[in-house]
Amino acid sequence: MRVILLGAPGAGKGTQAKFITEKFGIPQISTGDMLRAAVKAGTPLGLELKKVMDAGQLVSDELIISLVKERIAQPDCANGCLFDGFPRTIPQAEAMVAAGVDIDAVVEIAVDDEEIVGRMAGRRVHLASGRTYHIQYNPPKVEGKDDVTGEDLIQRDDDKEETVRHRLSVYHTQTKPLVDFYQKLSAANAGKPKYSHIEGVGSVDAITAKVLAALS
């Protein structure tokens, strides 16, 4: 089964991706990992990619699609794969269709922007240990201090409200249109890929149950 997981940053895709890959025994494929692996392996495509990246240029959709086709032909993808952060744009999605890369299921995890801002902007981290807290859902015993060491907690730049809002606005401009694209593709192709919209609010277990039901 080949699955695309859509959703804004902070919607909980990473958590659900882990459950999906374990349940179906399929690898999670990210373009970043694929790029690094191809360059390291020194394949003809890898060498071409290295040239582009060394020149500080953006890797074209055409090269990325070639990379995807090379990756999904590998033995560990025999039962399918989960695409992580790809496609990001309509041209990439169209290129996948044109290249004959069939997708079985597209799952959108939908979470309201304000909920995401609350989730992410409330995170606090103890850098030395990696322990994470949340000012609302999982607060430390003493405000701003790590429970174990009593050292200061910090808010990572990625979790600051203005950064979160910027990432959400990029998502709505670039990636949200994929929701319409795959809904229309599914309707035009007698339900292939199967498209599912899931509300990503509630307990992790409840959301996982909905995601797995959508894929069964």
Curated annotation (Swiss-Prot):
Enzyme class label: transferase
Keyword Membrane: no
CC per GO annotation: cytoplasm
Positions annotated to bind ATP: 10-15, 123, 132-133, 202
Region (LID): 122-159
EC number: 2.7.4.3
Entries under Pfam families matching the protein: ADK, ADK_lid
The entry's keywords: ATP-binding, Cytoplasm, Kinase, Nucleotide biosynthesis, Nucleotide-binding, Transferase
GO biological process, one term: AMP salvage
Catalytic activity: AMP + ATP = 2 ADP
Entry binding sites for AMP: 31, 36, 57-59, 85-88, 92, 156, 167
Region feature NMP, mapped onto this chain: 30-59
Pathway: Purine metabolism; AMP biosynthesis via salvage pathway; AMP from ADP: step 1/1
GO molecular function: adenylate kinase activity; ATP binding
Places the protein is found: Cytoplasm
Domain of life: Bacteria
Subunit structure: Monomer.
Annotated domain remarks: Consists of three domains, a large central CORE domain and two small peripheral domains, NMPbind and LID, which undergo movements during catalysis. The LID domain closes over the site of phosphoryl transfer upon ATP binding. Assembling and dissambling the active center during each catalytic cycle provides an effective means to prevent ATP hydrolysis.
HAMAP family: Adenylate_kinase_Adk
Database matches in PANTHER family: NUCLEOTIDE KINASE (PTHR23359)
Stated family: Belongs to the adenylate kinase family.
Cited function: Catalyzes the reversible transfer of the terminal phosphate group between ATP and AMP. Plays an important role in cellular energy homeostasis and in adenine nucleotide metabolism.
Protein name listed in UniProt: Adenylate kinase
Protein's organism: Pseudomonas putida (strain GB-1)
Lineage: Bacteria, Pseudomonadati, Pseudomonadota, Gammaproteobacteria, Pseudomonadales
